[in-house]
């Protein structure tokens, strides 16, 4: 989502180019206003065969109702990115610095959730002083949680930790 965030698309594009330089197996799809994204790419050194720009005509801002924006702005950079995440075999993840509410609402409405999981959770991975990582599941995104939600968060956090190579995660 090249248009999400206070400093988009400039900082998003710079971050995408940096990620490409750090991971030679990575490919990036930037969704957003193509002329603006291309202008930000000018003068940057990157492998053009690993970066695609998909033009979108709309942007979701932090001032909008997340649900209304996701439902009405079908050609927004976030909704198009979510659609690609769900439908495009080669798209495996999504990064957005935009509205957290819109990202979570969009993920729920456009991508769906694992059967049996009642609500999504934000899960940042933080570096530790010893060089490892710690996951903080939900990170305060849900103010009103029931016991079942906390159990689901624990299950999702465990699954995420295992994808990061942790053999026996502790919650």
Residue ranges and their predicted role:
Residues 1-2, 110-113, 143-147:
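Acidic/glycine-enriched edge-of-secondary-structure segments
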Residues 1-108, 162-171:
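Contiguous, glycine/small-aliphatic-enriched amphipathic segments in soluble metabolic enzymes
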Residues 75, 98, 116, 129, ...:
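Short, amphipathic alpha-helical segments
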Residues 135-171:
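Ligand-binding beta-strand-loop-alpha-helix segment within the catalytic cores
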Residues 26-28, 110, 122, 153-154:
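Short, charged/polar low-complexity linear motifs in solvent-exposed/disordered segments
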């Amino acid at each position: 989502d090249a248009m999400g965030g206070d400093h988009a698309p400039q900082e998003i594009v710079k971050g995408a180019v940096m990620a490409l330089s750090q991971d030679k197996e990575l490919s990036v799809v930037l969704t957003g206003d193509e002329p603006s994204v291309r202008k930000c790419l000018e003068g940057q050194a990157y492998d053009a065969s690993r970066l695609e720009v998909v033009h979108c005509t709309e942007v979701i801002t932090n001032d909008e109702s997340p649900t209304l924006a996701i439902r009405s702005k079908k050609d927004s950079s976030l909704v198009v990115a979510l659609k690609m995440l769900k439908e495009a075999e080669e798209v495996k993840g999504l990064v957005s610095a935009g509205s957290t509410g819109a990202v979570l609402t969009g993920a729920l409405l456009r991508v769906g959730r694992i059967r049996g999981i009642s609500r999504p959770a934000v899960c940042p991975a933080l570096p530790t002083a010893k060089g490892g990582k710690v996951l903080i599941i939900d990170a305060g995104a849900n103010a009103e949680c029931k016991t079942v939600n906390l159990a689901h968060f624990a299950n999702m956090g465990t699954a995420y930790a295992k994808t990061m190579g942790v053999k026996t995660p502790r919650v």
